[in-house]
Structure formats: C-alpha cells, structure tokens
C-alpha cells in the first residue's frame, strides 16, 4: 500500500537489456469529497398471485413443505403489497475517490461489473442485501436459462437489473459532477 497522499508516477526509462519504466512516489492530494444520493427505481413484479389467492391455496394445502412455501410466499407478498410494481430506493455515497452502492437486493455480478466499466477511474464498491432484502436481480438472459434458481425465485420481471444499473449510473453521474 502506498503512503498517505502519495501516488506512483512515471519517472524515466532505464536501459537494462530492455527498456524498463522507472516509477517514483509523488505528492497527491486525497479527495475530501463526501456526498450521498438516494437512487430510486420502479421495478415491475412478475405475474405473482395476490394475497387472497395465496390464502386460498393455504386453506387447501395439507401440512408439509408445500404449505411452508406458501406461508413464506404470503409473507413476501404481504411485504410487497398486492400491486404490480414497487419503487425501491437505495443510497449511493461518494467518499473521496470511491463510490459505495448499498443495494437492498441481490444483484448478479453484472451489476458491479457494469458500474466499474462505466466509471473506470473510480473505485466502485457494491454491497448486496444492504438495508434489507427484496429479491434476486438476475440478468435478462438468466431468466431464459432452465432451472436457474435465482431467476426461478426472483419476484421482479426480466430487465429489472438493467433498469437498476441505468438508475445507478445516472445517480453516480450526479454525485461526481
């Protein structure tokens, strides 16, 4: 690790059979920027049964794992509400030359890879399942793969991860201006 407020800078070429680059420490001031923004995105649900439908299924189901799954689905649907979509919000911080994204879902690694590609000169730290848990956010392509668990149990429609990436990019752009 480099000393505080130092950076490596190209110094000169040194001949040693082959040209070698020499690097030296130089003064570098640390960014003191500290800011936060709330990202908000409306995500559509998959075609999920409403609470009343789940309650009917629970009444018709004998004891066992099916009943347990229905009870869990009911708790999830109760939290989600009977609507067709939900606005999720999550904080994004700029701390110096780093960005922290605290997503309250479990996004595929495509989320952080996309943000890091979009902001190659910034350290982007993505935190999944922060401040609660809503669902998996698989890629569009993952929904078409047979028997892929995260896509099978996700509650949000295909494309919601990509929508979340777009909103995150726009929020980060506002922060770093």
Task: Go through the PLM ranges and name each one.
Residues 1-177:
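Non-catalytic substrate/cofactor recognition surfaces at enzyme active-site rims
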């Amino acid at each position: 690790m480099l000393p505080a407020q130092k950076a490596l800078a190209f110094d000169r070429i040194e001949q040693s059979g082959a040209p070698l680059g020499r690097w030296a420490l130089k003064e570098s001031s640390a960014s003191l920027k500290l800011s936060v923004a709330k990202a908000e995105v409306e995500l559509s649900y998959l075609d999920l049964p409403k609470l009343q439908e789940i309650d009917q299924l629970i009444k018709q189901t004998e004891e066992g794992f099916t009943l347990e799954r229905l009870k869990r689905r009911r708790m999830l649907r109760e939290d989600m509400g009977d609507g067709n979509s939900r606005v999720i919000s999550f904080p994004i911080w700029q701390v110096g030359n780093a960005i922290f994204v605290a997503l309250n879902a479990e996004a595929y690694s495509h989320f952080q890879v996309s943000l890091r590609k979009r902001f190659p000169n910034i350290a982007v730290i993505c935190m999944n399942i922060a401040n609660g848990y809503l669902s998996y956010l698989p890629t569009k392509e993952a929904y078409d793969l047979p028997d892929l668990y995260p896509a099978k149990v996700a509650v949000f429609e295909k494309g919601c991860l990509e929508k979340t990436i777009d909103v995150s990019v726009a929020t980060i752009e506002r922060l770093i201006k």
